[in-house]
Amino acid sequence: MRAEIENYVKKIEQSLELLWRSLDVESSTERLNELEELTSDPSLWNDQANAQTLLREKSNLEEKLNAFNKLKSNLKDTLELEEMAEAENDLETLSQIEQDLKNLSVIAAKFETECLFSGEADGNNCFLEINAGAGGTESHDWVSIMMRMYLRFAERLGFKTEIINMINGEEAGIKSCTIRIIGKRAYGWFKTEAGVHRLVRISPFNAAGKRMTSFASSWVYPEIDDNIAITIEDKDLRIDTFRASGAGGQHVNTTDSAVRITHIPTNTVTQCQSDRSQHKNKAQAMKMLQAKLYELEMQKRTDSVNEQNAAKTDNSWGHQIRSYVLQPYQMVKDLRTDYETSDTKGVLDGDLEDFVSASLAMNAGGRR
């Protein structure tokens, strides 16, 4: 077996071994058989809430076990083909097998990461909000770089994106933006990216070519679906409308279509100006508000256990999660997991999978 092929095979086999333990395949298969019996009972729908819960559990187990078995089967079939190609010294087929195994190793690594998703909202779409820290134009430019990085990351994962809100900087860059990320498990993939990000580089805006440090914060919250109940009273809301504006203060349109919603008890604010319809902007802003309030509630539960406050307050600016050093050397380092890479270009182009995997594994107690 050629060295490159052997390396990919080892990676996939290691992933399969970890997945076998993580999924607890034997117990999960037994539970799936049990769920199939329960959900085939006609009396199941006498309790609709319980029926929905059981069906979601069944669907989740089916998806994971099918993916595991498909991965295992694909590896077996590819190894059989590789054995025949080796015997015939079929270089063209061996080259294709190497590429197939490379692709399979990527799928295995992604599946391995997704098995660490455990939150009730991990499978949902999400919103990503990025805000500039102190530093003016330098920080505004850093927000625009981060926005591009996350758009590329979403694209790598096969997610769709919508820019819901964006406020441009006075000279360059972006003061703040909100992106909606659409796809299965989007929140699971993005949730560990919340925190403060520090950039060190030679400033393109400084004539003396000085090295500058910039900060920006990101906040991630899941889009709420019908399975999660969030109650918002009308009396707790203040709704303002205003004209959506573009760069340089120029109006995108001449109607008050942009909407800002304030949840008075928590002082949580959302706004949307992505559509010309005030009605659609209001609906999107309400979705974002539900998502933010859900995330705040989850943070309260976490705080009661960890005595940490990771909610979006001024203190969160001290919660630095990652540094991106471009000069005098090149290094991106996660300060929570100590995972680091010198491939700064790759990271800023959206190669974040290893950072996310390391964070999820740490949160799960080191399982990986």
From Swiss-Prot:
GO terms for cellular component: cytoplasm. The modification N5-methylglutamine is found at Q250. Its main location: cytoplasm. One of its GO terms (molecular function) is translation release factor activity, codon specific. Gene3D superfamilies: 3.30.160.20, 3.30.70.1660, Release factor. Methylated by PrmC. Methylation increases the termination efficiency of RF2. It holds the Pfam family PCRF. It is found in: Cytoplasm. Keywords: Cytoplasm, Methylation, Protein biosynthesis. Peptide chain release factor 2 directs the termination of translation in response to the peptide chain termination codons UGA and UAA. PANTHER family: CLASS I PEPTIDE CHAIN RELEASE FACTOR, PEPTIDE CHAIN RELEASE FACTOR 2. Belongs to the prokaryotic/mitochondrial release factor family. This is Peptide chain release factor 2. It comes from Rickettsia felis (strain ATCC VR-1525 / URRWXCal2). The lineage of its organism: Bacteria, Pseudomonadati, Pseudomonadota, Alphaproteobacteria, Rickettsiales.
